[in-house]
């Protein structure tokens, strides 16, 4: 039996997707047929820190919280309900970026993004002989 969007959310069958893009963090709820039923977003901008383009860990967490809050507001506006349970969550992040953590889950270096070109010197410099 196919559920309508409101019932999908109410019964905890909605799936949350989050994407950390280079200019926005986006969240979307989809139904069991992969149809978008609600969305939220947060605009952000990376910063040049010590010669590297990055996002602070605080910006990451604050952006995620704001994006999810925007999604919750969208659900409330469209369906008059709150999100209580989800069937699944998927998270993706911008291509060519990474975050390194230790076993205590502490960040080891600032978030490196696709905008960093510092390693290109390895490919443009003459090889040692």
Go through each PLM region and give its residues.
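Carbohydrate-associated surface elements
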Residues: 116
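N-terminal glycine/serine-rich phosphate-binding loop of ATP-dependent small-molecule kinases
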Residues: 1-109
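Conserved small/polar residues in nucleotide/adenosyl-binding loops
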Residues: 123-129
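Surface "functional belts" at beta-alpha junctions
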Residues: 112
């Amino acid at each position: 039996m196919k559920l309508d969007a409101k019932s999908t959310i109410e019964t905890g069958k909605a799936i949350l997707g989050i994407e950390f893009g280079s200019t926005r963090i986006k969240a979307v709820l989809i139904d069991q047929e992969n149809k978008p039923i609600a969305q939220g977003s947060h605009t952000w901008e990376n910063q040049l820190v010590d010669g590297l383009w990055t996002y602070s860990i605080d910006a990451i967490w604050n952006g995620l919280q704001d994006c999810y809050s925007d999604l919750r507001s969208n659900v409330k506006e469209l369906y008059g309900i709150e999100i209580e349970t989800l069937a699944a969550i998927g998270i993706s992040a911008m291509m060519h970026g990474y975050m390194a953590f230790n076993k205590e889950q502490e960040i080891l270096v600032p978030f490196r993004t696709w905008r960093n070109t510092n390693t290109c010197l390895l490919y443009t410099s003459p090889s040692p002989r």
